[in-house]
Amino acid sequence: SAASDVYKRQAEVEEEKRKICKSKVDSYDLSRLWEASDDIRSLKSLILFGIKGMAAYAYHALVLGKTDSEVNSFFYTALRAIEGESDPDKLLSLVLKTGEVNFRCMALLDSANTENYGNPVPTVVPLTIEKGPFIVVSGHDLHDLKLLLEQTEGKGINIYTHSEMLPAHGYPELKKYKHLKGNFGTGWQNQQSEFHNIPAPILFTTNCIMPVRQSYSDRVFTTSVVSYPELVHIGDDKDFSPVIAKALECGGYDEDKEMTGMNGGHT
């Protein structure tokens, strides 16, 4: 039943938390947030959703060797407020602080990205998928993309970004790879229809994955902080051999496939 699936997933999350959490903490019952008054619920939701996005950027910066003590400490400040603060004025102040620290975190990630991959430049990105084996990379972890580009170089496999990975084409140290060919499809919200019967593997590097449909489930791989039940996960060794093997097995399209972007264009 749906209820049993929810309880099973909650148990899996608790087990994962025990594995990765370095301190003993009690779980917060999120239903408490939704039971609060409209104003308190809205303010706390803004804070919660703000730090969720910030956590992803902070993680990517950390992978590239960049950290910020103010950003890190704010996670604790925000979570404590979500758990126990009930003063709307204090929460509003914290909402504004969330935006401020988010901006600081984005600057941190920008610094990490540009130091490793160069300053991005305006780039025309093709939306045509060339015939032959290819891999689609979704999410926004540039480090994972770089490692995949290195491992696929010279193997006759083209690489296409998807959704949030699109900006990768502007970075000199990534665009220098000739087999980084273009972008596949439109936004992450359309992935279930656009990936239908795709003759290639998809690698998800962050949590933009949607419930995977049977028409492409055998071609989906995850890595880093994203995973999905019954899918192959590429671990910390970052050995993308299973993804590469799947790309060669699938073979790609027999002829070039022209796709359109969000604005209806072809680049």
Locate predicted features.
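Structural motif
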Residues: 133-136, 157-160, 200-203
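Active-site cores of enzymes that catalyze phosphoryl transfer or operate on phosphate-rich substrates
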Residues: 206-267
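Short, small-residue-biased leader/transition segments that mark boundaries at the very start
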Residues: 2-7
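Short connector loops at secondary-structure junctions
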Residues: 161-179
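Phosphate/diphosphate-binding loops
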Residues: 179-214, 219-220
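A charged, amphipathic alpha-helical module
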Residues: 57-140, 147, 152-154, 250-267
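Short helix/loop capping segments that flank catalytic or ligand/cofactor-binding pockets
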Residues: 144-147, 168-171, 211-215
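Solvent-exposed alpha-helices and their adjacent loops that cap or buttress functional pockets
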Residues: 19-23, 36-39, 43-46, 102, ...
